[in-house]
Amino acid sequence: MSVPSALMKQPPIQSTAGAVPVRNEKGEISMEKVKVKRYVSGKRPDYAPMESSDEEDEEFQFIKKAKEQEAEPEEQEEDSSSDPRLRRLQNRISEDVEERLARHRKIVEPEVVGESDSEVEGDAWRMEREDSSEEEEEEIDDEEIERRRGMMRQRAQERKNEEMEVMEVEDEGRSGEESESESEYEEYTDSEDEMEPRLKPVFIRKKDRVTVQEREAEALKQKELEQEAKRMAEERRKYTLKIVEEETKKELEENKRSLAALDALNTDDENDEEEYEAWKVRELKRIKRDREDREALEKEKAEIERMRNLTEEERRAELRANGKVITNKAVKGKYKFLQKYYHRGAFFMDEDEEVYKRDFSAPTLEDHFNKTILPKVMQVKNFGRSGRTKYTHLVDQDTTSFDSAWGQESAQNTKFFKQKAAGVRDVFERPSAKKRKTT
């Protein structure tokens, strides 16, 4: 409930009055003295209840906010009127204005419908603030104090009369508040709905309602998905059982074959003497083979050592007398004109094989034809294809790239060709194995 504007416009009470209006159990309001108690940190105030419900907590928070809203303007007003002389001047001016207005016209005081507990507590708080400024009011003369006390008593009486009227109004509306509090939320929503424009309700048949159709379609779709999931799970289960069954059959068949092989193995008629003689033969062959390999290795080492001890002339004579033996040496054939060459590779072979001694230079496929009778332009490899060659042979072609750095005529290139380049110097001596020092 808002505070009347007329009461807000009244000047603050600057006196040492220490009484506040208090309502008793019968609803009567009387003035009682206020006993200022010292604040103790962590101690519960006397006015605070021992236990409170959620509604009381909300009401306490609302009262606290109202106190803060009322305290802000009064703090500003008190700060602005900290000077006693300025305060007296303001009070005198306001009183003169009120008296002048009262002489000219009758002021109609607004009717107070009700006063909340926060307002009563706000008045008590203001009076406590006024008591705290008692030391500053010692400079005011006695006549001013008496006049202000009279005004305070008059205003307190008027406030008491107004509160009595408010109590009567509250008693009449108290019976209806209980029923209103139960349906507070519904009335609040109804009040919001009243602000919006109302539309005429139109009946829609159940089968035409979109929401029902969508819900039924969604339920049907969900049911189909569940059935599909069940079907897939059943198929996976059957497939797994089939795989397990096949694996089991394979294991059983393998076990049967193993048992049959063991049954077929009959060692009753074996002769231990024959087995022993066969083992002795195998061991003798192995010993002989190991001895031969060892003797061959020793002979090879002795031959290498002998060749190392020979002089250069003796080594050359030895190599001429005993040429190098090439294993699987093939016959070197003659290739035809533009015949394709197939490289057979080079691998180490310590044993002679007839298949490696064949003539691999024999022509195949298109190489059987005589390509010397073809025109000059067709005497290239892969003629008419993407992989054809540019020249028939490179013997009669100059492939020098004159755009490269080597083809440029410079002092550095000339010096290199004359001193170090091979095949371009006027030297016709046979090169020796050792590099000669050039000065």
Curated annotation (Swiss-Prot):
Listed Basic and acidic residues bias regions:
61-70, 145-163
Major localization class: nucleus
Give a GO biological-process term.
mRNA splicing, via spliceosome
Single GO MF annotation: RNA binding
- The residue ranges flagged as biased composition, category Acidic residues, are 71-81, 112-122, 131-144, 178-195
Keyword Protein transport attached = no
InterPro entries, A to Z = MFAP1, MFAP1_C
Record-level GO cellular component terms: centrosome; microfibril; nucleoplasm; nucleus; U2-type precatalytic spliceosome; U2-type spliceosomal complex
Alphabetic keyword roster: Acetylation, Isopeptide bond, mRNA processing, mRNA splicing, Nucleus, Phosphoprotein, Spliceosome, Ubl conjugation
Q: Where in the cell is it found?
A: Nucleus
- Glycyl lysine isopeptide (Lys-Gly) (interchain with G-Cter in SUMO2) crosslink residues: K67, K249, K357, K371, K381, K415, K418
Annotated positions of the N-acetylserine modification: S2
In this UniProt entry, the residues modified to Phosphoserine are S52, S53, S94, S116, S118, S132, S133, S361, S432
Phosphothreonine carried by residues: T267
Q: Where is this region: Disordered?
A: 1-27, 39-200
Per the UniProt record, which residue ranges are transmembrane?
A: none
Q: Which domain of life is it from?
A: Eukaryota
Return the similarity comment.
Belongs to the MFAP1 family.
- What is the purpose of this protein? Involved in pre-mRNA splicing as a component of the spliceosome.
Report quaternary structure and partners.
Component of the spliceosome B complex. Interacts with PRPF38A (via N-terminal interaction domain).
Which PANTHER family is this protein grouped with? Answer: MICROFIBRIL-ASSOCIATED PROTEIN
Recorded protein name is Microfibrillar-associated protein 1
Q: Which organism is it from?
A: Homo sapiens
- Provide the organism lineage as a comma list: Eukaryota, Metazoa, Chordata, Craniata, Vertebrata
